[in-house]
């Protein structure tokens, strides 16, 4: 009986204290930032990767983004048929970066972060929804205000106030937007009829970016720096409303916007990226996420990918899909580096930019004496 009891205890002990496989040298040790060392925001951000949970995912996103920014063609093996001139140019060939975001992020203060990236030519291709276009221009004309998520809709409606989460957009903003954009549509229609101009969403967006002529606008900088902005859903939102009112006010063939030419241009951004690698950073989900991923499928997947959103995968939505699902479609390379940060992008993205794009811009400015 005693022997049997000892065997049972030994078995229980063996089960509880199962010997571990060593993780030394293969995994990062968990530990957060020690504020006894003073306040150092850069070190705090660097500590995210070893903090755990979504902080670690954010830290991984910072690492992958820096890999996007640091990559040069010279890092890859030189092909046998490479000429001497091509060898010299390899150091100047950088990763092509696609940035996608949903409209609410332009409604929010993330707009200024995106404006910074376009102003300094840190991204190469932009994709957003219609709200991400119109809200940028509207903010040049009038302000958006901080409210509360709990404000009653009927009360706001009676006051001509529109709610986006905890943001408030006065309806007068859209009246100002109409006053600004309709004369531009008039001129675009004249050019379509007299000069056979073929308008596409990206061409229209560039024209509007030129017309706004405001340095607080990311679309102004995209126009100025020749960064293409794609928006397949251009007939949605307030711009769609304005296109409707403009078209019904102009009998006969009205303003025509050709979306097919833009899907060719968008896919070509990925198809003809080689020998560049491609990196994708997507804030939110929906159309921008799929449009960028689908274009990169044309080249058998992006080499780097960072998703930041709060959507879940359990309903089969593309918005909630993890990077590995995109790998199954060939939208992210099977050898690519990818991470999803489950976080509100208004929190995560400015922090990511602070430890990636902004740091490199500051270092470059010091080197160049600016």
Swiss-Prot record:
Modifications made to the protein after synthesis: The N-terminus is blocked.
Full protein name: Homospermidine synthase 1
SUPFAM superfamilies: DHS-like NAD/FAD-binding domain
EC class of the enzyme, as a word: transferase
EC number: 2.5.1.45
Keywords: NAD, Transferase
Keyword NAD (UniProt): yes
NCBIfam families, per database record: dhys
Cofactor(s), names only, from the UniProt record: NAD(+)
Tissues in which the UniProt entry reports expression: Expressed in roots.
GO cellular component assignments: cytoplasm
Family per similarity comment: Belongs to the deoxyhypusine synthase family.
GO molecular function: deoxyhypusine synthase activity; homospermidine synthase (spermidine-specific) activity
Subunit structure: Homotetramer.
